[in-house]
Amino acid sequence: MIGIFCVFSGVLFLRLRGGSIVRAKGEDLLPEEAVTYRQDDMRWADDRLGDSVFTMRSSGCLVSCIASAVSIQADEEITPGELNQIFSENHVYDGEGNIRWAAIGQMPGYCAEVFSDVSGTEIEECLEAGNYPIVRVRVKGLGSFHYVLIVGRRGGEYLCMDPLEDDLTTLSDYGNRAYAVRLVYWEKQ
């Protein structure tokens, strides 16, 4: 029994390493309207990420988060399918379907930032500036890596657009643990 406990504890430690606990601070801050998308929407679910073998259904959470953030800020909807096509045409993806962040920043109107530190400070600063941070989480707190878009805070919780869910979720659904923070926002030209 002790052996099983030790193995379980070791696995849990390895799954959670590298993440930071982040909690919402300050008053409620809600968007006028949160644009939500699902990565598995049949209109784009089978679209490939660039020239890779990966599809929006399997690996499109990040693109869906970016599409949501840009749609909220630009006051013009851009779907994950449309954004994926734009990213593919502009060589934003590497051969494995990973986003090359510098390539996004070279596209007219798009700005991208990769934070070296993962803390609530970066998330709060993004929200206060009217931007929507993208955070890497683990599904159900312990599962595979996944990206969600933080769209605001309410009652001491961060509200998230999860591209695998129909409704807004909270960061506590992922253990309040973030493994990376990214930001893509739209600047009018």
Predicted regions and their residues:
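Active-site-adjacent structural segments surrounding the nucleophilic cysteine of cysteine proteases
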Residues: 1-90
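Conserved active-site-adjacent core of cysteine acyl-enzyme catalytic domains
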Residues: 33, 70-189
